[in-house]
């Protein structure tokens, strides 16, 4: 009889966006319980060892974490399989480096280097707004936070700008037509564009039509859309490519041009 959680994860069953090679062993690090879903996160061990290359082995990662060198969203984390996810800020004070976890246009996690000023806040999508004991309002965000007494104008699917030091809402963005968004799920994950219109289907999913800066239009579900700025200006800096997905021909031309330049 099964008792409790699975403690292992086979390498072949790990999410594709972790980009683990098949011949690197039988197992992959199983993410701990935390603010992000296990299929939508990147464990700290993979960030330090596979992405930043600050460690060669699992044991080296443990010793780095136990020296309390790694912070996620301003808090020291010592759990080697802590699940960092979309919009999380990973800081290494010893090297004065800050990274924000974003998606590239192929749907893979990208550690985007940011300045100290930008590392002080993060954008959180509002999951729901409820009332607790004695009618105290509070909101839940997509990264598992609960914030009491929010602005009454904030509604589900809006995005809040959260000060990580004070844990307070600084500003918020309404989920409206004309605002810039990033897609966080589905085949268009990582693409950035402006909301053109919302299609409401009774008893089914709401469809959002988005147009990127090159004029290409695409559609996705409401749950996959994350507002990142007012108008066409995003509040966070974006990785190289600015969330514009190239066609296969455009990618091939770009590759040829870079090879000829080299």
UniProtKB/Swiss-Prot annotation:
Pfam families: 40S_S4_C, KOW, Ribosomal_S4e, RS4NT. Residues 42-104 form the S4 RNA-binding domain. GO terms for cellular component: cytosolic ribosome; cytosolic small ribosomal subunit; nucleolus; plastid. One of its GO terms (molecular function) is structural constituent of ribosome. It comes from the Eukaryota. The keyword Nucleotidyltransferase does not apply. InterPro entries: KOW, Rib_uL2_dom2, Ribosomal_eS4, Ribosomal_eS4_C, Ribosomal_eS4_central_region, Ribosomal_eS4_central_sf, Ribosomal_eS4_KOW, Ribosomal_eS4_N. GO terms for biological process: translation. HAMAP family: Ribosomal_eS4 (MF_00485). This is Small ribosomal subunit protein eS4x. It comes from Arabidopsis thaliana (Mouse-ear cress).
